[in-house]
Amino acid sequence: MNYFPLSQQQQDWQQLAADIASRELGQRAQETDRTGTYPKDSLDALRREGLWGLRVSKEHGGLGADMLTTCLIVEELSKKCPSTAMCYKMHLEAAEIICRIPTTYQIEHFVEPMAKGEVFSTIAG
């Protein structure tokens, strides 16, 4: 049940995430969790599908997705592989922080490469 009316674009993103999760993440999830390994192959699948720059603004080559769309995508991924969804969400959070008020250096070395899928970002607590 959705409490927010979803645009067609949001529904399309949600379906794409569900398809990727079923096709790519589900088959690796049990092994990733059993061995406690980093879900590199699953994250690479998200990168190949163009989701790496989800929270990077369109101005800097990203998708410029809003928070609701982001939540829909992460929710679908987590249904098949919570580990991948968590790592991906950490990347998105760091990307959003860097993209808020980036310097020219950050745009060139982090933001634009993130949008292209060349850089993985994360945060530490």
Where are these regions (language model features)?
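Intrinsic disorder at enzyme termini
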Residues: 1-9
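Short, flexible segments with low predicted structural confidence
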Residues: 16-19, 49
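Glycine-rich flavin
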Residues: 38-48, 52-125
